Amino acid sequence: MKKLHHLAAAACVVTLGLGLAACSSSSSSTTTTTTNTAASGSAVAHVACPNGTLTFGVEPYDNASVLIPAYQALSTDLGKALGCKVNLQVAESYVAEILAMKNGKLDMGEFGPAGFVFASQQAGAVPLASFADSNGQLSTYTAGIWVKKGSPVTSLKQLAGHTLALSSTGSTSGDWVPRYALIQAGVQNKVKTEYAGGHPESLEALLHGKVDAAEINSQTEASAEKAGTFNPSQYTEIWKSQPIPNDPITASGTMSPAGQTAIKNALLHLNASAFTSGKTSIASELDFTPPASGQVMIPVTTAMYGQLFALAKALSLTTSNL
């Protein structure tokens, strides 16, 4: 488990690393894969990627070794639709992705709902689309706090005096939402929180008995069940959040309106295979079931994530914390 932090320090995301994960080469600052297309001279490519390349960042909600193949089909199909190269990058941290867009290193990015709050305020990220559920509505997920079955801890208040693994600072379901729940329960200063370094690591901390409780969101739960590494019948979920809107895919605020529109239209018309193909897929990673027919991605607006902006205000988090 990575360095532990007391709950009081969680509000300051400034402590996060500012780099991007490097896997493709020792000198690279990103985990990157490039999709080439033959139609780079199209009018769409001219407005969406005038330099011939579109850089697409993804938040590190799972390991890069999992996310790169999961997002490869989307990157490939998006590149074909736009007629340009798409460089796929998995950020090293939530803040790293925000700063990459702020510093002109990303043209578009998928942010977690909490990350989008800061990306909107700090980097001018413009929401384009998100993932639809089987009914064609914006898909959602939940945060949860789990304990081993038979644990004397059965509620948030009873967490006082116990250890709790959260995922990483800046995570919506792994930090902001459960931390606010502890505040509402009046035990925020009585629980020893440990930032495990990610959603899988938070789950592992509970599985290996390193903590008394752990935040496990519905997406991680589903992925771990599918992989056979988590049996929910042996654990108890003592708290569950209200539904959280799924990640928006955004464009940099410095991109031309025409470019933003071109990318949005391309996303809205991608085939379902872009989200469901492969051993690991976006749909399985984000735990949503796409519509049987129709658009897999639907338009989203900043207003749809208003609850996260309100939560940031309630926790006194601003872009100055970056």
Task: Tell me what each language-model feature is.
Residues 142-153, 244-258:
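A bilobed periplasmic-binding-protein/Venus flytrap-type ligand-binding module shared by bacterial periplasmic
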Residues 44-57, 62-69, 73, 251, ...:
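An extracytoplasmic/periplasmic, membrane-proximal ligand-sensing/linker region
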Residues 24-27:
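Bacterial signal peptide processing site
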Residues 58-60, 90-94, 104-123, 130-132, ...:
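Beta->alpha turn/N-cap motifs
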Residues 55-79, 91, 114, 138-204, ...:
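Bilobed "Venus flytrap"/periplasmic-binding protein-like clamshell domains
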Residues 99-158:
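Acidic, polar ligand-binding/catalytic clefts
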Residues 126-138, 192, 226-243:
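Short beta-strand->loop
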Residues 18-22:
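C-terminal motif of bacterial Sec signal peptides marking the signal peptidase cleavage site
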